[in-house]
Amino acid sequence: MHVDDCAEGIIFLLENYSDLPHVNLGTGEEMSIKELTEIIKSAVGFNGTTEFDTSKPNGTPRKILDTSKINNLGWHSKINIDRGLSDTYVWYLENYQ
């Protein structure tokens, strides 16, 4: 989740929600490590190969939050992972090169 979406989601909840229990903020989209790797490679222009060691544990089988509560309140994330990573990389190049 992009920090801008996170900040907007928190402000939205402060203005529109005062109940219990908790509310999850997120994109509501699940992604594999391989998919994330491909997006990062594209964002930074890496054309090499990547290798995955399938003998290692893969951690939690599902890595997604249920965002239906905040979505039903009318809030949805706006910045997808492709744009967020691309923007972050451009910012990095402009500020640290």
Regions found by a protein language model. Give the residues of each.
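C-terminal substrate-binding subdomain of Rossmann-fold SDR/epimerase-dehydratase oxidoreductases
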Residues: 1-97
